[in-house]
Every structure is written in structure tokens, then in C-alpha cells.
Swiss-Prot record:
Organism the protein comes from: Nautilia profundicola (strain ATCC BAA-1463 / DSM 18972 / AmH)
Processing after translation: Is synthesized initially as an inactive proenzyme, which is activated by self-cleavage at a specific serine bond to produce a beta-subunit with a hydroxyl group at its C-terminus and an alpha-subunit with a pyruvoyl group at its N-terminus.
Highest taxon of the lineage: Bacteria
Protein name: Aspartate 1-decarboxylase
Cofactor note text: Binds 1 pyruvoyl group covalently per subunit.
NCBIfam families with a match to the protein in the record: panD
Pfam families for the chain: Asp_decarbox
Gene Ontology biological-process annotations: alanine biosynthetic process; pantothenate biosynthetic process
Keyword Membrane among UniProt keywords: no
Residues engaged in binding substrate: 57, 73-75
Quaternary data: Heterooctamer of four alpha and four beta subunits.
Amino acid sequence: MTIEMLYSKIHRATVTDANLNYVGSITIDEELMEEANLLVGQKVDIVNINNGERFSTYVIKGKRGNRDICLNGAAARKVHPGDKIIIIAYANMTPEEAKNFKPAVLIVDDNNDIIEKTTYLQEG
């Protein structure tokens, strides 16, 4: 049996653009992707802090250093530039794996610069 657990998240990212005419996904700065252990095509949940919307999409790589967080396609209707969002990835693991797993958690500022990288400590 496996359970779905938090794998990584980028907390309070600022939406820099919303592109309705793109085929879909979320564009994330390459450096933020690496620090959060996210891969191109990986499924993520998006939680919009401003309006409460919650939806799923997949990751595409943005230009390193631009700090872009852009929602594309239909997801662009659920955000506005300047909105604060949480980007969450999950992974399936056994309960034993979950006891020792430490997800990557990035806290970013208003410019999407990393101000803290941490993990959620788990007992076990």
C-alpha cells in the first residue's frame, strides 16, 4: 500500500503572468524548480491564496533567474498577476518511506526570490 504525501511546495509565490492562449500548465523559473525538486511535466496543485481557487496542472520550465510564475491556458482564468499562490507536489510512498521523507519547502518573497528552504520535520 502507498499513501500520497507532500513531496515539495513553493509557498506564497507571486503570479507574474497569466497566459490564456498557451496550451496549459504553470511556467516556473528553472532555479525554483530545482530547489523544489520539481520536474518538467510533473503534476502540481495550485492554491490561490487571494481567491481560494484550488486546481491541478503540470510544470514547464521557465528561464532561470527570471522568477517567472505564469499560469497558462484555462488555469489563467483562475489567477491574476500579483496573486499569491502555493505550488504543491505530492508523491506516493509506503508508510515506512513517509516516516523518514522530508519534503522540500521553499518560502519566497514578493519577487519570488527564495528567503528560506526548509523541510517539514516528521516524527518516526
